[in-house]
């Protein structure tokens, strides 16, 4: 070992420039490798943060001609689909039509000038069960109460500091379609950055869009039972899909397909 070290020192002394370039090159290569692997790990871990993430699937229409996936469904059709296979444990939806990614929320007693921007989403109550929202305080069972809302821990800290936000009221700027004030019934743990779910203020979608077969603005996700046969579930749902498609295009009825796509697969699709 001593001889090896002495030879390396002598080599470095005789070829300082070449040795420094080699060391610099190896350093850059190693740093690049680490950055690439960190990004790969980040991407492969996308949407793996939810409890039972391997059992969560998106309900997607597959376009016959191109094979592309449509990730939104009419709510009345999707609700029927949820009840049409024994392999589905639960399912829920989010409304693109009613949400807003940038809403100013504030405490009424402090006024709009203290507002903090946050996302605002309307979801079905079962959406919380599908993705396993982790409650830090409060009770998710109160989610369906009138004008109830749940907020992420990060927003709770910004708005309330060390105070307990449960039972407190938050308001959003006037002019929005929904109620201007909400009562916080629970605080949930923030989702990581490599998650499709955003750290929004969530309220109950309730009965909205339940009778509108022409409105495709609700992505649906289901949690299937342990060891469920995904292809069997798709076959269970297909007759309803064909019946729905028949009302729009009699000739293409049998070409319609509904696929259950896993969360991580949906991200890379």
Predicted regions mapped to residue ranges:
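Short, glycine-/polar-rich solvent-exposed loops and beta-turns at beta-strand/coil boundaries
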Residues: 140-144
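Membrane-proximal extracellular/periplasmic loop immediately following the first transmembrane helix
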Residues: 36-104, 114, 209-210, 215-223, ...
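Membrane-interface anchoring determinants
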Residues: 10-11, 19, 267-269
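Mid-to-C-terminal secondary-structure elements
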Residues: 121-137, 147-269
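Glycine-centered tight turns that cap/initiate beta-strands
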Residues: 17, 86-90, 164
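Short acidic, glycine-rich loop/turn motifs
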Residues: 63-65, 105-110, 172-176
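Short, strongly hydrophobic transmembrane alpha-helices
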Residues: 15-44, 54
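A short amphipathic helical element positioned immediately N-terminal to and/or at the very start
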Residues: 4-13
